[in-house]
Amino acid sequence: MPAEFPDFRLGNVLATSFTATLTERHGDAVERIPTPQRLVDWLAVNGLAVDSCTTAQLELARELRESIHAAATATAIQDALPASAVQVINDCSIQGRAAAILTPEGNRQWRLSSASCVEDALGVIAADAISI
């Protein structure tokens, strides 16, 4: 990964790791997926490898990321979930066609419908957000 980009902040939960691709939201924001290729890199690190990403797909990913952040924040402060965030999360989950497979080692692995389907990867992230 190029040195000019900040390191990814990875955790054990896919959806919250995804929200960590933008940090310092209330200060000098640090964008960790500033380009489509950087989103491809992040997805690969998280087991959701795709061949490429368009600018429109990057924008959809950022919209999903901020929707997950808004829903998680509302949950943390025991507020109502923002309807627009719920809609984006649900839409991304519905549009994705990834399948969970069991590896010989007994682990879950995601199989995307094609290596070019960022929407499948976003569907996995959205489903993870729904589960938490």
Residue positions per predicted region:
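Short helix-coil boundary/hinge micro-motifs
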Residues: 1-132
